[in-house]
């Protein structure tokens, strides 16, 4: 019953929102990786296909231009992948520590609140036990049973 009123219920909202945002970002990054890798593979295949030697000189110059264009696109896709890796590293280094520290601080605050609640509960139980013991002693010392035993 105490857990429902504690920090665990309130912490699930931001945590769920952060998880949803992280999932969305992960999907976007995976889509970006798929697009870039597909581009690299397609452009490489086109370069290999165009690299066949043909007889007419006009066709060879067109194929050379096509190879240049495909090589340029391949380099752009590879550069995009390198930027993505760099971005992932920066995110892991900077955002990871910040969010981890925030989460740790939040959990420390929640545990401090739970410790305070537990201490108050234990103090109340001690007071109740003390009052009950005094009441039992009072009944014992004033009872007829005690008088007959002494």
UniProtKB/Swiss-Prot annotation:
InterPro entries: Med22. It is found in: Nucleus. Its main location: nucleus. It comes from the Eukaryota. Keywords: Coiled coil, Nucleus, Transcription, Transcription regulation. GO terms for cellular component: mediator complex. One of its GO terms (biological process) is regulation of transcription by RNA polymerase II. Residues 99-127 form a coiled coil. It holds the Pfam family Med22. One of its GO terms (molecular function) is transcription coregulator activity. Component of the Mediator complex, a coactivator involved in the regulated transcription of nearly all RNA polymerase II-dependent genes. Mediator functions as a bridge to convey information from gene-specific regulatory proteins to the basal RNA polymerase II transcription machinery. The Mediator complex, having a compact conformation in its free form, is recruited to promoters by direct interactions with regulatory proteins and serves for the assembly of a functional preinitiation complex with RNA polymerase II and the general transcription factors. Belongs to the Mediator complex subunit 22 family. Component of the Mediator complex. This is Mediator of RNA polymerase II transcription subunit 22a. The gene is MED22A.
């Amino acid at each position: 019953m105490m857990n429902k009123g504690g920090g665990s219920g309130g912490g699930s909202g931001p945590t769920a929102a952060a998880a949803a945002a992280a999932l969305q970002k992960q999907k976007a990054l995976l889509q970006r990786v798929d697009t870039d890798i597909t581009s690299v593979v397609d452009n490489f295949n086109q370069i290999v296909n165009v690299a066949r030697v043909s007889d007419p000189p006009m066709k060879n110059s067109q194929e050379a231009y096509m190879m240049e264009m495909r090589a340029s696109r391949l380099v752009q896709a590879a550069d995009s992948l390198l930027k993505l890796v760099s971005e992932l590293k920066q995110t892991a280094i900077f955002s990871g520590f910040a969010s981890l520290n925030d989460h740790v601080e939040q959990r420390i605050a929640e545990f401090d609140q739970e410790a305070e609640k537990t201490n108050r509960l234990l103090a109340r139980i001690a007071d109740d036990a003390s009052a009950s013991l005094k009441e039992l002693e009072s009944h014992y010392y004033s009872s007829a049973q005690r008088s007959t035993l002494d």
